[in-house]
Structures are given as C-alpha cells and as structure tokens.
Amino acid sequence: MARIAGVDLPRNKRIEIALTYIYGIGRSLSQEILTAAGVDMNTRCDNLTEAEVTKIREYIDKNVKVEGDLRRDISMSIKRLMDLGCYRGLRHRKGLPCRGQRTKTNARTRKGPARTVAGKKK
C-alpha cells in the first residue's frame, strides 16, 4: 500500500483516482502530477514500483500544497478576513454565506436548523 502525504492510498484503484484521496488533489491535478512524474495513469496502486511512488511523492512535496498545510492556509485566510473586519469576514463570523446567496429563505447549511420565532404568523 502506497503512503503519500500521510494518506494510505487504496490498493485496488487506479493511481489517477487513488491520488484524489489526498486532501487538495482532484482529478486534473492528479493527472498533472502523474504526467510530470512519468507514471501511467491506468496503473493500479498495488502495481506501482517503489521508484514511481518516490517520484510522485517528491513532486507532491515540492510543488503541491496538500493535507495539513492546505487546511492551515485556508483557515488562516478566513481568520485574516475576520480580523480585517471586511464584509466577507463579517459573514464568516456570523456563519452566513459570503458569496452573495440569498438568505431570506435558503442558506440552511450555513445558518443551521430553522429556529421558530414566536408570534411570526401572518
């Protein structure tokens, strides 16, 4: 079983798909990594040689921000927005959508379950 960036990749899947189990790597980035490392995309994880795994691991370490580093960067960006006090930061602070979606009727994912207000009947 190949272990890259602290993640155990599933053995039975193609390496192109298996790399997407790493946080921060999707299909297109996975294909880019494999092309740069010179590894066939249709190879199964358990058929990879140690040299191929090393090439993939080195490319990811050198060129791609994944897992903990990426999570930390994202949370620091959100924290920076909140500290600035800009509109997006305020929306993050209040737990509301920050990209212009309507909130009168929808946005239940960000706002949480609906709380009934007494005396709000028409």
From Swiss-Prot:
<dbReference type="InterPro" id="IPR027437">
    <property type="entry name" value="Rbsml_uS13_C"/>
</dbReference>
<feature type="region of interest" description="Disordered">
    <location>
        <begin position="97"/>
        <end position="122"/>
    </location>
</feature>
<dbReference type="Pfam" id="PF00416">
    <property type="entry name" value="Ribosomal_S13"/>
</dbReference>
<dbReference type="InterPro" id="IPR018269">
    <property type="entry name" value="Ribosomal_uS13_CS"/>
</dbReference>
<dbReference type="GO" id="GO:0006412">
    <property type="term" value="P:translation"/>
</dbReference>
<keyword id="KW-0820">tRNA-binding</keyword>
<dbReference type="GO" id="GO:0005829">
    <property type="term" value="C:cytosol"/>
</dbReference>
<dbReference type="GO" id="GO:0003735">
    <property type="term" value="F:structural constituent of ribosome"/>
</dbReference>
<dbReference type="InterPro" id="IPR019980">
    <property type="entry name" value="Ribosomal_uS13_bac-type"/>
</dbReference>
<dbReference type="GO" id="GO:0019843">
    <property type="term" value="F:rRNA binding"/>
</dbReference>
<dbReference type="InterPro" id="IPR010979">
    <property type="entry name" value="Ribosomal_uS13-like_H2TH"/>
</dbReference>
<keyword id="KW-0699">rRNA-binding</keyword>
<comment type="function">
    <text>Located at the top of the head of the 30S subunit, it contacts several helices of the 16S rRNA. In the 70S ribosome it contacts the 23S rRNA (bridge B1a) and protein L5 of the 50S subunit (bridge B1b), connecting the 2 subunits; these bridges are implicated in subunit movement. Contacts the tRNAs in the A and P-sites.</text>
</comment>
<dbReference type="InterPro" id="IPR001892">
    <property type="entry name" value="Ribosomal_uS13"/>
</dbReference>
<comment type="similarity">
    <text>Belongs to the universal ribosomal protein uS13 family.</text>
</comment>
<dbReference type="GO" id="GO:0000049">
    <property type="term" value="F:tRNA binding"/>
</dbReference>
<comment type="subunit">
    <text>Part of the 30S ribosomal subunit. Forms a loose heterodimer with protein S19. Forms two bridges to the 50S subunit in the 70S ribosome.</text>
</comment>
<keyword id="KW-0687">Ribonucleoprotein</keyword>
<keyword id="KW-0694">RNA-binding</keyword>
<protein>
    <recommendedName>
        <fullName>Small ribosomal subunit protein uS13</fullName>
    </recommendedName>
</protein>
<keyword id="KW-0689">Ribosomal protein</keyword>
<dbReference type="GO" id="GO:0015935">
    <property type="term" value="C:small ribosomal subunit"/>
</dbReference>
